[in-house]
Amino acid sequence: MKMLGATVHPVTSGNMTLKDATNEAIRDWCCHPEDTYYVIGSTVGPHPYPDMVARLQSVISEEIKKQLMEHEGRDYPDYLMACVGGGSNAAGTIYHYIDDERVKIVLAEAGGKGIDSGLSAATIQLGKLGIIHGSKTLVMQDEDGQILEPYSISAGLDYPGIGPMHANLAHEHRA
């Protein structure tokens, strides 16, 4: 990024997770709108960012279609499975198959030390409807609506929310 002229500001607040980096990026964007552009690589945050990321990541499902046609003679799998934290990998994997009922979609989330342990990032299983980073989605939160810190050994799966696309698919029992 630096080679392309970007100024990189490491996040030193909180636990230095995706949530903390997103907090700082949005804060800087709001405080310096004249020279700051907000771009994120995960399907979280306010519209249109989750949709933009999903569309850009859709090259994954395009490649799946192409390779399946090449090797199997059909362009759809029986199942698609992808991990979800913020959800960019999953969004790209399922993008061109969301409306194809022949394809079963499985979203895997970080269970941590077990969903009943209090040390988990299983937002689909444990989250409640809430707002995080300008997006209405499933969020790990307490009874007062305060966001809880998720637990995962994976840096990409420790987000306390989930992309709204994935929350909707879970709500509709599509994933």
Task: Explain the meaning of each model-derived region.
Residues K2-M3, I94-E101:
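Alpha-helix C-terminal capping segments
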Residues M1-A21:
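A glycine-rich helix N-cap at a beta->alpha junction
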Residues M1, I64, L80-A82, G87, ...:
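Buried hydrophobic positions in well-ordered alpha/beta secondary-structure cores of metabolic enzymes
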Residues C83-I94, I115-S117:
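Short glycine/serine/threonine-rich phosphate/pyrophosphate-binding segments
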Residues K66-D75:
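Phosphate/pyrophosphate-binding loops at sites that engage ATP/ADP/AMP, CoA/4′-phosphopantetheine
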Residues G14, Q57, L80-G86, E109:
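Active-site nucleophile and cofactor-binding loops and adjacent substrate-binding regions
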Residues D51-Q67:
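Helix-loop module immediately N-terminal to the HCX5R catalytic loop
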Residues K19-A54, R74, D99-R102, L107-A175:
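Active-site/ligand-binding loops adjacent to catalytic centers
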